[in-house]
Amino acid sequence: MVEKQKINEVIVVEGRDDTANLKRYFDCETYETGGSSIDDRDLERLKRLEDKRGIIVFTDPDFQGERIRKIIMQAVPNAKHAFLNRDEARPKGKGSLGVEHANFEALNQALAEVFGGEKVTDEFGSAKTQEPSSDRSSVSKKELLTELTQTDLMSFGLVMAADSRKRREFLCEQLRIGYANGKQIKKRLNMFKITKEQIENVMKNY
């Protein structure tokens, strides 16, 4: 029997189909919000889980999923976050976007990004060493400590440009941090400690 890679943190998902898909590949426990609903009792439980085990928010890459993520982000600021691109969460037939539709490679990459590594496990369950990705490890300590400014965003055309939305969509998808609008983008990039060097490298391909 193949041994699945264990995820110590509790993964927060929207429904049981998301749970089932994750458990196909990983030894993990999930907390289901029950679709788009999340209340104060859920948030209190998630706070306790974060204190005891840590949580990874892994909601769907759609409006409701981002709404739930933002609510949890405000209530549990230390929570980790995993993201799927919209294409990775698209069903083969009709239906809405969801973690339940993602294949192993997409799930594995999303979880690896949480820990700053290349991959959590291979498809057969063998654990891999979680090494920092090359673009992050090459960044100096000084750069990591420097937060992005509104001027930086403007210089990359992420705000105040005719195609700013498309630029943000491209950048956020490549960095796997979930879409952020013009008001959110600076906070989102700084939260994930994204540097100007990383943005430059990504936007070269825009």
Curated annotation (Swiss-Prot):
Enzyme class: hydrolase
Coiled coil: none
Cellular compartments annotated: Cytoplasm
Cofactor(s) the protein needs: Mg(2+)
Keyword Hydrolase belongs to the record: yes
Top-rank taxon: Bacteria
HAMAP family with a match to the protein in the record: RNase_M5
NCBIfam families membership: 5S_RNA_mat_M5
Protein name: Ribonuclease M5
Species of provenance: Lactococcus lactis subsp. lactis (strain IL1403)
Upper lineage: Bacteria, Bacillati, Bacillota, Bacilli, Lactobacillales
